[in-house]
Amino acid sequence: MNYIFSGIFLYFFLCFLLYIFQRRIVFNKSGHPGAPKDYNLANTEEVYIKTEDNLKLLSWYHKGNNSLPLLVYFHGNSFHIGDRAYRIQKYIEKNWSVLLVSWRGFGGNEGNPTEKNLYKDAEAVLKWIKNNTEFKFKELVIYGESLVSGDAVEMGTK
C-alpha cells in the first residue's frame, strides 16, 4: 500500500515540477552565436531587426541573387542562429538571399520569449524585409523549426 501512495506522490510531484519549470523547458534559451564568419558564411552580415517594443534582434543576412527567393529561417528551441548555419549554407552557395532570424531571449538577444512576443518578432521581420530588401512577400520561402513553426505559418499568411 505504501508503494501505491509513494507512486501517486511521485507522480504529482513530477507534474508539479513540470508546471513550475514549463517556461524553461519550452523556451530553453541559448547563448550568443558569435559572427557569421565563425561559421564560414560568406558575405553574410549581422543585422538588427527592431521590434515594436524597441528590442533589437540579432539576425544574419546574406544578399544573394534577386532573381532567386529569399529564405527566411527561424531557428528552433535550444538553439541560436550559429547552430543552424550548416542548414542554410547550401542556399548561400546557390546564391539565394538568406535571413537567419534570432528570437528575443535567444542568441544573446534581450527580451522574454512568449507566444505573443514571438509573433511580434515575426511581424518585425516582415517589416524589416519590406524596408530593407527588394523582395516581395510572394518571393519568400519561410522556414520555421520546432518551437517557432507556428510563427512561420502565421507569417506566411500575412
Which ranges hold each PLM region?
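A generic structural signal for alpha->beta connector loops
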Residues: 43, 54, 95, 137-139
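An N-terminal hydrophobic leader/cap segment in hydrolases
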Residues: 3-50
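Solvent-exposed polar/charged
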Residues: 19, 157-158
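Aromatic pocket-lining residues of Rossmann-like dinucleotide-binding sites
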Residues: 91, 155-156
